[in-house]
Structures are given as structure tokens and as C-alpha cells.
UniProtKB/Swiss-Prot annotation:
It comes from Nitrosospira multiformis (strain ATCC 25196 / NCIMB 11849 / C 71). The keyword Lyase does not apply. This is dTTP/UTP pyrophosphatase. Its EC number is 3.6.1.9. It is found in: Cytoplasm.
Amino acid sequence: MTFVENRIYLASRSPRRQELLKQIGVDFMVLPLREALPRIPDVDETPLPQESPPEYVERIARVKAETGRKRMSERGWADFPVLGADTAVVLNGRIFGKPENPLHAKQMLRALSGQIHEVLTAAAVAAGNGTRVCLSRSSVRFRNLGEQEIDHYLACDEAYDKAGAYAIQGRAAVFISGISGSYSGVVGLPLFETAQLLEESAIRIFQ
């Protein structure tokens, strides 16, 4: 299916994902999945029983994209592809989503301290020709963190809407001694894989 305009809907309120799309020149409009207060998920992000971390993020990204496309259709909006994404931090098979409160955030950072964890980000594009999903996997190494610096970091308030309670593009960059994989994927949207999905829906990055 070819779209008249080189434009997409982004089914996310994430400022990081918006900035990443701007970085590669994608013309997009934000499509909130429902009217919601900040920090309330647009979809139910509860993992299913026996669901692996990769299956989890791929499912949530798909649901976000397809829910956005359903809303687009119900409201009679212009027919553009809908991009959804989801990120999870995984340590020893355990999924770390967004922290529920400051204590939860502190527990996450304590667990990540001195460890190598995996960051999974799935992107999904729902269009007239179906839904395509991609998965980015990256490894991130944290140095050992002291209690005081964890407290100071949490006081800066950048942790609470991030998977794993940290922002690699923010002050938490000083915690990270190494990364293998996709930096943009760790931030929240793997640009290489996302560009490939968009190309498959006739959205050209360079035209």
C-alpha cells in the first residue's frame, strides 16, 4: 500500500521517541491511544503468564500500534501508518518496566548496580497491509552504584517514566560503563530497525 503523504502517526506520548523520529526526519503526528493522565499506560502492560521478555515487548508494541490504528479509523482521520513501541529492561529473566514509586525505582537501581542487563525495544507499524514488528536487543553494563548517588539521581526526577528507572540519555549516562547494541533502542526506539519497518510501509527516510 502506498500512502499519498510521507507521514505517520506515533502511538506514544514519549518525548524520547518523538525526538528520535525528528532526528531521522520522519513527519509524524502524535496519536494518544486514549485521554489519560501522565504515567498511566495507554494499554494494559501486564505480562501474560509464561510470556518471555521478547514476546512481551513485541506484543505490547503491536497492541499499541493496532489500537492506534483502530482509533484512527473510528475517528475518520487520514489513513497513515501507525508506529507503536515498547521498551523493557531485563535482568536475569526479570522484566523491569517503569517504576511505580520512588522505593520501586530505588530497588531497580540497586538490582542493576554492577550488573550487565539487557534492554529490549520492540517497534510495530500497523498499516493497511498488516502489522510488522521488529525487536532490538542491547546489553548495558552498570558500574557499582552507591546509595547516596542513587538517592541523588532519583531526586532529579528523570527516572520515573523510564523502563528500569534510568535514562541513558540523561544523568544516568554516568552510571553506564559499556553498551553493546543499539543506543537509540536503549533510549526507546531503535532507528535502524524502525526505518526498515517504515520503508516496508512506503515511508521513505530519504526520498
